[in-house]
Amino acid sequence: MSKNITIILSTHNEELSIDHTISELIKHIKDVEKVVVDDNSPDGTLETVKKINYPKLKIFNREKNKGLASAFLLGLINSSGDIIGWLDSNMGSLAIKFPEMISKLDNADIVLLSRYVSGGRDDRNIIRVVASRLINNLAKFILRSKIQDLSSGIFLMKRKVLLDVVPVASGHGEFMVEFLYKAEKKGNNIIEIPYVHPVDIEENSKSFPNLGRFLLLGFFYILRLFQAIFRR
């Protein structure tokens, strides 16, 4: 199969991590196209990306922070790869997993990094680990899904998946739960491979600046689950 690959990166205040993430992607994926969608970061993220000398780098700057879902859709529209992936901009250390993910696509439509299969682990603090597991298990129960880590958000897929499943361009991380659910429902073959969610990105996490914010986002995740069931 062709190995023309695009990785989409959504950024907001990632000045300290984006250069490392892009460098790691270049290191581990040959001739990869990167699409960076920045939501008007005030910290210098955009300037940092513009200084990176790499020919297959597309940069889009949005005037407002419109969320991960619409950033992903914008990245899809402007991608050229027949394999498309998503990686959090502060998780460059996980770029090392992409060669394995690419090889697994020979027998799958989507390859997903998972904390909840054998060999996977979540090394963040106990509150985050328990809360994430609770939301994930609730999602599996409501959606009757066999996917072990619906909220991972780190994946590669064949472009043909988009013929059956179009992401809904609203929301933040919960959009990916709905996307994976619909892809599974359409019969796409989804393989999960283990990864260890590292500790060192925790302070930069957008989904958990504090427990209250995390619980609020959890509510929107659950609301999105029921919307996914009834949305055509």
Where would I find each of the regions flagged by the language model?
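A conserved acidic beta->alpha catalytic loop
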Residues: 38-47, 91
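Acceptor/aglycone-binding surface of glycosyltransferases and processive sugar-polymer synthases
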Residues: 62-78, 83, 96-173, 199-219
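Hydrophobic helical membrane-anchoring modules
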Residues: 1-5, 10, 16, 20, ...
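Short, acidic, metal-binding catalytic loop of nucleotide-sugar glycosyltransferases
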Residues: 23-31
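Conserved donor nucleotide-binding strand/loop of the catalytic core
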Residues: 32-35, 46-78
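Acidic helix N-cap motif at the loop->helix transition within catalytic regions
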Residues: 16-20, 43-51
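Conserved sequence signature across two-component system core domains
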Residues: 11, 37-39, 62
